[in-house]
Amino acid sequence: MAYTYTYPRMQVTVDAVIIRPADDGEEVLLIERKHEPFEGCWALPGGFVDMDETLVDAAKRELYEETGLIVEQLTQLHTFDGVNRDPRGRTISIVFIGFASPGSRIKAGDDASSADWFSFDALPPLAFDHDKVLEMARKKISSY
């Protein structure tokens, strides 16, 4: 039985920080957004959680839809819940981290006009609060 709430609901999204080794350190996978908000800006692969999927399944689906990459093992990194982090409204993002092999092939699709690997030391300007997300991810992987 469905229940209708009388108060506004938050939106739930997932993002994937995917890292691969490179000659000069690590690289992170980013997509160029095809649609507003932040059309044409670089961002982490991610999107909205469907009602019939788990958070990790949503992260894997969004990663595959936007980059063609399959990463079996994703680990929850952090929940980002800043009140004004998304211009579309109140949005909570659960971020996952995973690793890809050096020769991993990617191909932009769905909401991404392109996808590419970037050195942590040469990141483009990022959409949303993804600079903070990557700062946290970099600290996490340096502690391994």
Q: Regions from the language model: what does each represent?
A:
Residues 49-73, 78-141:
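Unchanged
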Residues 1-43, 56, 71:
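N-terminal strand-loop-strand
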